[in-house]
């Protein structure tokens, strides 16, 4: 499995905040997918930095078009710890808007993170809506899952079990 942190979908953000470039990050995710790896994307949503509907929409469409609609994408809540203490935590309503935007744009497995408890931390079958994998903090319960498929309708559910 390959987890890639796409910090923002802006070269300006990468240059100013990360001292890096966005394109190599995107290229590494595409290469991992081309090599047949299970790729998951994580984006820490920072208020006023990378949370606009335009930027999140561009990121979502890039993931769908370059990594595939089945790519799990985790939109995680920012908390003002460590270096960025000049802004508050990401409002849950903003994360919920991004989740809905991801679903509307065709991503089948978006998730919210750092918001426990929240139903959108869990995995739902995109075909029948069954709760396949329930997440609550660090707890994971496999529910309507048979192997790699939804036990209700047979839809493939992409995931990797910890430790293998």
What are these regions (language model features)?
Residues 49-164:
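Auxiliary Fe-S-binding modules of radical SAM enzymes
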Residues 1-90:
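Conserved AdoMet/S-adenosylmethionine-binding subsite of the radical SAM
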